[in-house]
Regions:
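Juxtamembrane helix-capping/reentrant segments at transmembrane boundaries
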Residues: 15, 74-91
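Short, hydrophobic transmembrane alpha-helix segments
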Residues: 35-47
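Membrane-embedded catalytic cores of phosphoryl/pyrophosphoryl-handling enzymes
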Residues: 108-200
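Transmembrane alpha-helix boundary signature
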Residues: 66-73, 99-112
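Alpha-helical transmembrane segments
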Residues: 44-59, 117, 147
Length: 200
């Protein structure tokens, strides 16, 4: 019995670690910087990538942390569905503002298309979240792989197992059901691929 309890504890610890490492804000940092550097070179790409991250991830996540600190949100993953729509709407407005800034900075088409895909993904996720709890972690993971595969290299598809790992983690810690994770992954990859194939 103690061995089974220990195994369960280990799985949950691993699931929480995966949840943090594969959180949307981390993935936004990764994908914006990779796409920006790939399309604009090291120096300019890094600068533009940081600008894109600020509007797409940094600012919204900062507001989430403030909300948690003030007791307005349960946690930084916003586990309660009813708390998500307002934050996601604010994030959507922030990303749209980022698009305007990137256009003004004459950002590369690939980076601009990436942020357009983020806007579309957020809009769809917000619509679903208004009545059902979708896995934003799974959507972000699948969307990240799709974006990197289309905008940088198909070799990035080799990271697809990380989407499965992320889904497992969210189910293991009981933040989502398998269906919520599966729908999140489908929405994330589908919206990203659809938008990029039209815009990029």
């Amino acid at each position: 019995m103690s061995a089974l309890l220990s195994q369960g504890h280990t799985r949950r610890r691993m699931a929480r670690l995966v949840t943090e490492v594969m959180s949307p804000v981390v993935l936004i940092v990764v994908v914006t910087l990779i796409v920006a550097v790939h399309s604009a070179g090291a120096v300019r790409g890094m600068a533009l990538g940081l600008v894109a991250f600020f509007f797409a991830g940094g600012l919204p996540y900062g507001l989430v942390l403030i909300g948690v600190r003030r007791g307005l949100l349960t946690d930084h993953h916003i586990s309660r569905r009813e708390q998500r729509p307002l934050i996601m709407a604010i994030a959507l407005a922030s990303v749209v503002a980022g698009l305007v800034v990137l256009r003004w900075l004459d950002a590369p088409r690939a980076l601009f298309a990436l942020v357009v895909a983020m806007v579309a993904g957020l809009a769809v996720a917000l619509a679903i979240t208004s009545f059902w709890k979708i896995s934003i972690h799974a959507a972000s993971a699948a969307g990240t792989v799709a974006c990197l595969a289309i905008l940088v290299s198909p070799w990035w598809l080799l990271l697809a197992p990380l989407v499965v790992l992320t889904g497992w983690a969210r189910v293991e810690i009981r933040d989502h059901t398998p269906v919520q994770v599966s729908v999140g992954a489908i929405v994330g990859a589908g919206v990203a691929a659809g938008v990029l194939l039209l815009v990029a």
